[in-house]
Amino acid sequence: MASLGDLVRAWHLGAQAVDRGDWARALHLFSGVPAPPARLCFNAGCVHLLAGDPEAALRAFDQAVTKDTCMAVGFFQRGVANFQLARFQEALSDFWLALEQLRGHAAIDYTQLGLRFKLQAWEVLHNVASAQCQLGLWTEAASSLREAMSKWPEGSLNGLDSALDQVQRRGSLPPRQVPRGEVFRPHRWHLKHLEPVDFLGKAKVVASAIPDDQGWGVRPQQPQGPGANHDARSLIMDSPRAGTHQGPLDAETEVGADRCTSTAYQEQRPQVEQVGKQAPLSPGLPAMGGPGPGPCEDPAGAGGAGAGGSEPLVTVTVQCAFTVALRARRGADLSSLRALLGQALPHQAQLGQLSYLAPGEDGHWVPIPEEESLQRAWQDAAACPRGLQLQCRGAGGRPVLYQVVAQHSYSAQGPEDLGFRQGDTVDVLCEVDQAWLEGHCDGRIGIFPKCFVVPAGPRMSGAPGRLPRSQQGDQP
């Protein structure tokens, strides 16, 4: 399968070849992509029609509607190809299928998907009448044109009036089609990212192979002897992939009343900048490899989260770049939890959006935009044996602007798209333009049309921008 960069590059060059009228070059680019998406198959079909090869166009449109069974404009153009091949019964069937995919709407605007064309219901009915004329169904053709006139914009009936007059005189009607030279084009947002990007950067040493190294935070695995302390305070497993982020979990730290254990997995590991001297300890987080607090010692949390020896401490598990189990007072406020989390993960604590795991077997993550949501989370956690579980999410360090709910299902047309089902909640990471958003859903990141979603509720604090009011109730 071609990479996203190769796909977008071939797509863009093919569209430029269409603009120049170089049909052979355009077909080579559109058809040369392995397993092309539906929009590229549609482009190839349109170019075959322009080149005067309706048979090849029919095969290309067959692939397009097979890959995307809801592509109304694909059935529309396939009907045109069948019409040019004098297969009028097949053309009539395709035009009816195109009208069915309009789902009662007056038009479908394909501009936001890259095609500068709006498929109108009256145009489809006009082509239905054209095929019926070729089949000798004059009464049905006149009825189809009258229905098309009812869907035509007010005050602009002259074109269909002349067509109806021609049908009543039993004259043929040429079919309408997508304007010459119009094809699906890649979004300009993708064209800006065709150049390679170094996501990993330079490697950093996070674990020393020297046993006597005094660097803090990460140490090589220590030998275990018969007299070694079985309550070892540190265990680090070296990994050649240290310093890169490959998964949602890479280390877990548990701070209890009588022990402190830290484990770094081979998948992922936080980076350590300081080497050569001991760093001052943050309150509430014991040094890795050092002695933990005794049975009567309570780690002090920032902002009062761990203060107050008279109140019992509970474990709060937080998932960020890695999982951290912190000790905090039950019912601690939002600022106290963020301050306590900031001692271990300053960057995520500032940019990430906190969510809590709802109770139940099919529990989902519920955002915590304000203090009231956190207190509700504490109430739910009181009846849950696993305690309060939080998630500090920001999709690779990127903050979540706000959340939207899918009003309609959206099928990804290519690897750059984010598909989802009706009712799914999507985290919005970027407002690409007036018609497109970039979002995160079920561990995947991609772009999707704004008209498929509606706001999920109040915006998260500090999130810029607004979902346009005109898009909130649209349907595709």
Swiss-Prot record:
Residues 279-288 have a biased composition (Low complexity). PROSITE patterns: PB1 (PS51745), SH3 (PS50002), TPR_REGION (PS50293). Residues 259-308 are annotated as: Disordered. The keyword Iron-sulfur does not apply. This is NADPH oxidase activator 1. TPR repeats lie at residues 7-38, 39-71, 73-105, 122-155. Residues 260-271 have a biased composition (Polar residues).
